[in-house]
Each structure stands twice: as structure tokens, then as C-alpha cells.
């Protein structure tokens, strides 16, 4: 027989798998877009060109496997969330983050089906990516909470210590700003504006090219990315007073600082590579990791729903 600890570890491991699955779905979504495979299965869903298997074309294969892996990852996400809910009535964080994951898995799947019939709609495609990020963050945060339930000293107990109100407001403001910037970047990509600014850091040889047409879209994204880099570059200074009391936030701050530096570098590589697919995948991977890192920091600024969770079966019937 397996004990409560073994069951909790099994749940956490499967949640790890489900979280990685949603990460892969996000990457496949962008691969689908940048290989022009969105209509590889025609304007049909869930069928692919009238059948249940794809044709021989590369675009059909990419779109088919994007749909298939999305379906498997979505089902696995539902399974682990329901499993976690049945195992843990408390703390509230398990139920809340699980609910966020389920809601946005459903929403992004619905938008994905709509996108089949409107693949040229940049706002819909950007929303599709944004909701996928929210689903990924919800499941990723539930995964982190499950780890903290097994070992509260890994982060749960730090949340009881409090922190400077200014740091909390700063982190949440940066999180919301980052979400808006990610949406804008996705919108720019789906508008086909990625190469409107040739070269980096200059735009078509100009430091300030002005705001005209597609050039304005990508230039605004660059300015927004620069602002995010400055905001996160200042985060260690804002968090300096809480460094000793909140090592979780301090370490997280350094991680997101590295991630945003890599993200800006990957953006430069993307432009200089003329939107190579591998550069695009790197850019999307880093922004997804950065989003989860910022979401973790934001959650760690909030007090826990209960003082100290008990490892094992917490509040389950």
C-alpha cells in the first residue's frame, strides 16, 4: 500500500507532467503560426481535411499534432486539478490556481477552435496565446503550491513574514504590465510586423524611426520591452530591504532579472536571424518562463490562506 506521502508525490509528479504539457502546447501554437500551418487541416475542427488523420503535407502534420497534443495536455490538466481538489480541501491556493487553470484551458481551447475559422484575426490569435499563458501559470502555480505543501520551508512559511507594501505593489504592477506587453508582442507577430524594423537595436538604421504603419507596431514593442527591462532591473533595489527576511523573493527577483535579460537578447536574435523558427521558439520559451516567474513572485507577496499547511492529505475527506 502507498502512504499519504507517496500519493502526494505522485500527484505532484503528474502535475509536473501536465505543466510541461501546457508549455509544449504554447510552443506548438507558435510553431503552427510561423510555419503557416494554421490552415493545414483546412477550416475544419475537430476533423483535419475531412478525416481523423492528417494528410502528407508538413502544414497538415504540424496543425494535426498541435491539436492532438493540446487535447491530451488539456485532459491531463483537468485530471490533475480534479485530483488535487479531491485530495486537498485546503489550502485555498490549490483550489484557486486549479480553477484558473481549468477556466483558461477551456477558454483557450475555445479560442483555438474559433481561430481555425479566423486565422487572420491578430486580436483573436493574441488572446489565444494570452489565455494559454494564464492556463499555464495557473497550473504552474498549483504545482508550486503542491511542492510547498510537502516542504513548507520552500516558500510557504516565508509568506507569513510579510514584506514592504511598496515591493508588493511594484511586483503586481510589473506583472500586469508584462501581461499587456506579451499580448502586444503576440499581436505584432500575428500582424506580420516582425521584420518591419530591420536591424537591432536600431530600427531601419534609425534610433527613432517614428510611428508609421507596421513599423510603429514593432517599434512600440521594442520600447515596451526596454521599459520592462528597466523595471525588472530596478527590482533588486526595490527588494533590498526585504532581502534577509524574504530570501524567496530575493532569489526569485534574481531569476526573473536573468530571464528578462535573456528575453531581450532572444528578441535581438529573432530580428537578426530574420525571424528564424528556432529563434522564435527560444523567444516564446523565455517569455513563458518569465511569465511564470513573475506570477510566482506576485503570489509570494500575498499572505498564505492558512498559517502552516500539513504535508500529506490536507483537509481532505
List where the protein language model places each region.
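Polytopic transmembrane helical bundles with strong interfacial aromatic enrichment
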Residues: 1-317
Amino acid at each position: 500500500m502507498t502512504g499519504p506521502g507517496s500519493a502526494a508525490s505522485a500527484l505532484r509528479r503528474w502535475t509536473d507532467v501536465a505543466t510541461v504539457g501546457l508549455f509544449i502546447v504554447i510552443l506548438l501554437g507558435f510553431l503552427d503560426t510561423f510555419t503557416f500551418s494554421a490552415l493545414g487541416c483546412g477550416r475544419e475542427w475537430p476533423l483535419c481535411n475531412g478525416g481523423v488523420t492528417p494528410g502528407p503535407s508538413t502544414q497538415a502534420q504540424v496543425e494535426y499534432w498541435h491539436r492532438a497534443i493540446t487535447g491530451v495536455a488539456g485532459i491531463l490538466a483537468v485530471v490533475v486539478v480534479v485530483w488535487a481538489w479531491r485530495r486537498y480541501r485546503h489550502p485555498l491556493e490549490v483550489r484557486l490556481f486549479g480553477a484558473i487553470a481549468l477556466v483558461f484551458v477551456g477558454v483557450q481551447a475555445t479560442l483555438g477552435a474559433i481561430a481555425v475559422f479566423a486565422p487572420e484575426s491578430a486580436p483573436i490569435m493574441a488572446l489565444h496565446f494570452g489565455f494559454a499563458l494564464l492556463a499555464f501559470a495557473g497550473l504552474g502555480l498549483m504545482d508550486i503550491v503542491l511542492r510547498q505543501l510537502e516542504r513548507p520551508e520552500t516558500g510557504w512559511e516565508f509568506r507569513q513574514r510579510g514584506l514592504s507594501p511598496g515591493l508588493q505593489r511594484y511586483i503586481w504592477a510589473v506583472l500586469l504590465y508584462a501581461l499587456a506587453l506579451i499580448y502586444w508582442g503576440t499581436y505584432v507577430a500575428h500582424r506580420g510586423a516582425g521584420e518591419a524594423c530591420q536591424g537591432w537595436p536600431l530600427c531601419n538604421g534609425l534610433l527613432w524611426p517614428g510611428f508609421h504603419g507596421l513599423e510603429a507596431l514593432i517599434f512600440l514593442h521594442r520600447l515596451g520591452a526596454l521599459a520592462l527591462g528597466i523595471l525588472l532591473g530596478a527590482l533588486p533595489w526595490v527588494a533590498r530591504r526585504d532581502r534577509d527576511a524574504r530570501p524567496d523573493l530575493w532569489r526569485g527577483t534574481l531569476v526573473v532579472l536573468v530571464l528578462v535579460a535573456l528575453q531581450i537578447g532572444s528578441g535581438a536574435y529573432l530580428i537578426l536571424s530574420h525571424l528564424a523558427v528556432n529563434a522564435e521558439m527560444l523567444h516564446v520559451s523565455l517569455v513563458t518562463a518569465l511569465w511564470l516567474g513573475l506570477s510566482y513572485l506576485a503570489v509570494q507577496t500575498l499572505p498564505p490562506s492558512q498559517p502552516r499547511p500539513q504535508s500529506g492529505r490536507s483537509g481532505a475527506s
